[in-house]
């Protein structure tokens, strides 16, 4: 087994047994909204599982809760449960969007970069809900993030993760949705440079969404590709 939190394999069965936890979790701190425009989110004082079953083929909802709920203290926590060949697709049209072929690149280019824009690299992250999982390979996690930016501005973000798990409790595939406008505004306001500066050494072509010019295949430039 790859995860210390797995309890055991059922003998003679392909099901995975995860540590039993109550069907509700009551230790969540109330969310304190920093939004100028919204009242405090209608966030429950305790987390209720749609399916509290822990005798599961894949991962149970209580196990998913324990795995993802620590992201506020450790941004890397999510990727501790990533398969080495995990593929991540960040949906939308913004600097984080794209298809990542390994978890390390996805983490550095998104969560790590975003975390560096937040004061003291601290963020309050909570789960709104968990759907699916258990005997289904796919699960959906709804997150709410709350922090203060390096410039002292209140910051909020809601994110949706759609995850495919294997029978060892590792994530094999992720599609995630974020607020593109919030991401772009946060990077623009809090990064000293926006993807590049005169201190960056460029060794790869970065032509933008339009791709390389047609002349690239007719000159020595084409031989370098």
UniProtKB/Swiss-Prot annotation:
It catalyses: 2 [4-(deca-1,8-diyl)-2,5-dioxo-2,5-dihydro-3-furanyl]acetate + H(+) = 2-[(1R,8S,14R,15R)-11-hydroxy-14,15-bis[(6E)-oct-6-en-1-yl]-3,5,9-trioxo-4,10-dioxatetracyclo[9.4.0.0(2,6).0(8,12)]pentadeca-2(6),12-dien-8-yl]acetate + CO2. It comes from the Eukaryota. Its EC number is 5.-.-.-. Phomoidrides A and B (also known as CP-225,917 and CP-263,114) are potent inhibitors of Ras farnesyltransferase and squalene synthase. CP-225,917 and CP-263,114 inhibit Ras farnesyl transferase from rat brain with IC(50) values of 6 uM and 20 uoM, respectively. CP-225,917 inhibits squalene synthase with an IC(50) value of 43 uM and CP-263,114 with an IC(50) of 160 uM. One of its GO terms (molecular function) is isomerase activity. Pathway: Secondary metabolite biosynthesis. Residues 1-19 form the signal peptide. Keywords: Glycoprotein, Isomerase, Signal. Glycans are attached at residues 146, 195, 217. SUPFAM superfamilies: NTF2-like (SSF54427). Belongs to the dimerizing cyclase tstC family. Dimerizing cyclase; part of the gene cluster that mediates the biosynthesis of the antihypercholesterolemic agents phomoidrides which are dimeric anhydrides. Within the pathway, tstC produces the bicyclo[4.3.1]deca-1,6-diene core of phomoidrides via the dimerization of the monomeric anhydrides leading to prephomoidride. The pathway begins with the highly reducing polyketide synthase tstA that catalyzes the formation of a C12-fatty acyl-ACP, starting from one acetate and 5 malonate units. The hydrolase tstM is involved in the release of the C12-fatty acyl chain from phiA. This is Dimerizing cyclase tstC. It comes from Talaromyces stipitatus (strain ATCC 10500 / CBS 375.48 / QM 6759 / NRRL 1006) (Penicillium stipitatum). The lineage of its organism: Eukaryota, Fungi, Dikarya, Ascomycota, Pezizomycotina.
């Amino acid at each position: 087994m790859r995860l210390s939190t797995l309890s055991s394999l059922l003998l003679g069965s392909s099901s995975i047994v995860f540590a039993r936890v109550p069907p509700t979790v009551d230790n969540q701190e109330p969310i304190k909204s920093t939004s100028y425009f919204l009242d405090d989110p209608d966030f429950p004082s305790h987390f209720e599982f749609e399916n509290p079953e822990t005798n599961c083929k894949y991962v149970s909802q209580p196990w998913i809760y324990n795995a993802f709920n620590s992201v506020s203290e450790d941004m890397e926590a999510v990727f501790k449960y990533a398969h080495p060949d995990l593929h991540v697709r960040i949906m939308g049209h913004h600097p984080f969007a794209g298809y990542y072929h390994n978890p390390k690149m996805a983490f550095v280019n998104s969560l790590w970069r975003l975390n560096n824009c937040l004061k003291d690299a601290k963020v309050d992250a909570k789960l709104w809900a968990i759907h699916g999982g258990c005997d289904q390979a796919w699960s959906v996690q709804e997150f709410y993030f709350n922090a203060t930016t390096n410039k002292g501005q209140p910051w909020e973000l809601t994110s949706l993760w759609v995850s495919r798990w294997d029978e060892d409790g590792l994530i094999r595939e992720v599609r995630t949705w974020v607020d593109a406008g919030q991401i772009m505004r946060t990077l623009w306001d809090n990064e000293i440079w926006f993807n590049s500066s005169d201190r960056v050494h460029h060794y790869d072509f970065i032509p933008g969404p339009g791709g390389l010019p047609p002349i690239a295949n007719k000159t020595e430039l084409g031989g370098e590709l």
